[in-house]
Amino acid sequence: MSEGAAGASPPGAASAAAASAEEGTAAAAAAAAAGGGPDGGGEGAAEPPRELRCSDCIVWNRQQTWLCVVPLFIGFIGLGLSLMLLKWIVVGSVKEYVPTDLVDSKGMGQDPFFLSKPSSFPKAMETTTTTTSTTSPATPSAGGAASSRTPNRISTRLTTITRAPTRFPGHRVPIRASPRSTTARNTAAPPTVLSTTAPFFSSSTPGSRPPMPGAPSTQAMPSWPTAAYATSSYLHDSTPSWTLSPFQDAAAASSSSPSSTSSTTTTPETSTSPKFHTTTYSTERSEHFKPCRDKDLAYCLNDGECFVIETLTGSHKHCRCKEGYQGVRCDQFLPKTDSILSDPTDHLGIEFMESEDVYQRQVLSISCIIFGIVIVGMFCAAFYFKSKKQAKQIQEHLKESQNGKNYSLKASSTKSESLMKSHVHLQNYSKADRHPVTALEKIMESSFSAPQSFPEVTSPDRGSQPIKHHSPGQRSGMLHRNTFRRAPPSPRSRLGGIVGPAYQQLEESRIPDQDTIPCQGIEVRKTISHLPIQLWCVERPLDLKYVSNGLRTQQNASINMQLPSRETNPYFNSLDQKDLVGYLSPRANSVPIIPSMGLEETCMQMPGISDVKSIKWCKNSYSADIVNASMPVSDCLLEEQQEVKILLETVQEQIRILTDARRSEDFELASMETEDSASENTAFLPLSPTAKSEREAQFVLRNEIQRDSVLTK
């Protein structure tokens, strides 16, 4: 709308247009605060759902679970293997059952087994020959003996060869001789068997002297020692060879008749008859044990006893093993289970181990395996529960932070809605003349922020004062000047109580002398509890009585201004129609003044109103600490110049502080935005610290130059 159209339109139409524009601005601000963007809608626009992101803690939880299960599984496998090892040690070492009749009671399972007595006597006692058949036929030797030998068997065949006439006196049947056996039948009386012991395969010669009557013919004893009892022995294959003991020979001799003769004896009646030769029993002695020589002592292992057995085939080394070992050289371990099975009467219980030491070692090894598995399981369980607790704490922290962000978004939207409904009256600004006004017109009265809200100070004759109307250009310039640019989000609203989050930039006023505002006073308004206090410059005629009382009550006041925060943006952007109606109200002749960025406390001294006779100027500056009312005009100008110098120094110091603060804020903001992708949405990107400081310095210096030019006029 052009200025002419604005001048022609009624005041109500202008107010309605401004109200509609501000309504749209407020809606956009509310949508931006809610995070919905420009297309967010109006007051009732719902907050868009946030994107759900998969948390890394869940994946790490599953990985930790698998990392804990795998060692437990391996531990159980080890336990099973150890049990199988124990079973193999106890059960797998038991040998097959060995019959007890083939095992010596002395524990010599591999040694020959000796019988105390023969099971039966040899048959056909009337004959002089006892033969033992073998698997291989015998070969007769030159001396009349036949013998055969297999690798593991020794057998002996004894034969009797008779060289006599075909007929023997007193016998009907001739004696037949064969190379294998000799049979003599005596019809008169049983033959007399004489006990003779002769060397193996020995026979009588034809020229031998016959024995005396009644005396047995004997020959020399063998050169090797004999045992008291002749027994049969197992030689590698346990093949028996039966012989007669001396006691049995004596019994047989005593029971025979002296009148009878055998093949080896003759009676006196037949002394002239030719003699025949025969062989007697020969005994194979296999029980001759001799200790081994010194060089053969190492033949038996595991403390076995070495001895030599001399047989017909030669000497053989044998080992008498200790209990628990077996084999040719005692090199095989034999558990006690074999001895239990072989001789259960010697053991009342069942023992599975070879000795107490072996048993203790095996029990200790199995116990160590089980204990190690339990320890590993405990450590794994503790690590799992600790990780689970940490993950739960992290999830709770993320949930709390997410709830805090949602709460901040909802709070900002609620504040914007409350600002739209609040009755804040922005007052129009009336541009004053550039030339100074004569004395005793306008003074300033100031009220400063305090913890409680400040009531508005009204004048009794304020309603009768004339109202100054302003052009739409002036109003738009004032609105444009009073609109703040949105500051970037900061994690802190104040920096250690020294400086707060400063505005990035204040729009330059279209009015060149915006910092030199002739006004009647400054009044403090605080319409909303959570917003900072605003200073408003109000134009009205001087009321000496009111001003005098006001100045006296404000002596020695301290400045304690709260810095503006991010919530001040909706304060100017969310205005409804009721707020804009105030432009045409009797109080529509004021403009907000930005308070000082520093938090200095200054004492303001105000003289009496009766001494004030010059023009007083209200300053709208970044660093206007205090405006003092002085008595004469010349003194006021001097104070203004001094104040400008002080103001420049203060501005430079504050610019330096703001630059450092914003650099730290930008660094923290950048780090937080990179770490948390779900940070709050920002309307504008932050400027670099150098650009900010340069623009602020240019803005402040330009304002000070304009102020100096006005004061020098």
Swiss-Prot record:
PANTHER family: HEREGULIN-NEUREGULIN FAMILY MEMBER, PRO-NEUREGULIN-3, MEMBRANE-BOUND ISOFORM. It comes from Mus musculus (Mouse). Interacts with ERBB4. Direct ligand for the ERBB4 tyrosine kinase receptor. Binding results in ligand-stimulated tyrosine phosphorylation and activation of the receptor. Does not bind to the EGF receptor, ERBB2 or ERBB3 receptors. This is Pro-neuregulin-3, membrane-bound isoform. Residues 288-331 form the EGF-like domain. Gene3D superfamilies: Laminin. GO terms for cellular component: extracellular space; glutamatergic synapse; plasma membrane; synapse. Residues 28-48, 119-220, 251-282, 449-496 are annotated as: Disordered. Residues 1-362 are extracellular. Residues 34-44 have a biased composition (Gly residues). Residues 127-148, 195-207, 254-274 have a biased composition (Low complexity). Residues 149-163 have a biased composition (Polar residues). Expressed in sympathetic, motor, and sensory neurons. Residues 384-713 are cytoplasmic. The gene is Nrg3. The chain crosses the membrane at residues 363-383. Belongs to the neuregulin family. Keywords: Cell membrane, Disulfide bond, EGF-like domain, Growth factor, Membrane, Secreted, Transmembrane, Transmembrane helix. One of its GO terms (biological process) is modulation of chemical synaptic transmission. The cytoplasmic domain may be involved in the regulation of trafficking and proteolytic processing. Regulation of the proteolytic processing involves initial intracellular domain dimerization. ERBB receptor binding is elicited entirely by the EGF-like domain.
